[in-house]
Amino acid sequence: MKIGLMLGATGPDSSLDDIITMVQQAEAAGIDSAWMANIFSFDAISTLGLAGRVTQRIELGTAVTPTYPRHPSAIAQQALTTAAASGGRFTLGIGLSHQVVIEGMLGFSYERPARHMREYLNVLMPLVRGEVCNYSGEQYRVANLGLQVPGSEGMQVVVAALGPAMLKVAGELADGTNTWMVGPKTMESHIIPSLRAAASAAGRSDPQVIGGFPIILTNKPDAAREQIAKQLTMYGTLPSYRAMLDREGVDGPADIAIAGDENLLRGEIRRLESIGVTTFNAAVSAVEPGATERTVEFLASLAG
């Protein structure tokens, strides 16, 4: 299992330089990958393209970029450019976002979201493979469209998928999933078997499973969880995440956080590896002085 570092999920970053420096520091520490959330700040695909120019080894990915605001050809072109800028180290993570954002803020219809994602991928995937796309659906119609971006070959696409319909789409058409607010029991009983079954039925190889979890190395786990609960409370109010927390049988985001000493963290991460998570994506919560640095250092010892 690879070890990733999530950027932007537990709070805002102060500057573009800060984010790029975090990626450089993660690479220097030995972390395998860095994944950036695309929320209401810097554009994640663009930022990782910049980070790719000043790093050499670390894998880069979005976790995740919403689909609705951008035509699949536009996001394909931007993502392939970032893949080229990073020397082929970029994975495009896409997702639906949430109804409150897509309908309430942006004014798009959020009706039949899984159908939207299926159509989106039917346009996107041929384009990222360097093929000419011809597709006619309810939402997207594309004719004789192709992209040529030298140096971008082999870029993978993962989809934030939680419900059965989305997991089916991700397994059939994409290269895996990127989860958030999903506990280990739900990962083992629902996410991974559903995704693998869909991939197998479509004749695809075992998909990537990138599991995002809040994490902190601390000798005060109860106090840390209190702080994490304050940081992440909003996630527990969003219906798709709430459904996963309910399935896990927990009250809120802090209850799936991994907080404790080295032995506890190591055990929880190895548990996730044993059930099929391919990348542990660490959302390090800076809940006490020095917390981020020592947690990243510990995670780096598990990488590779």
Q: Residue locations for each model-derived region?
A:
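Active-site-adjacent structural elements that line small-molecule/cofactor binding pockets in enzymes
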Residues: 1-304
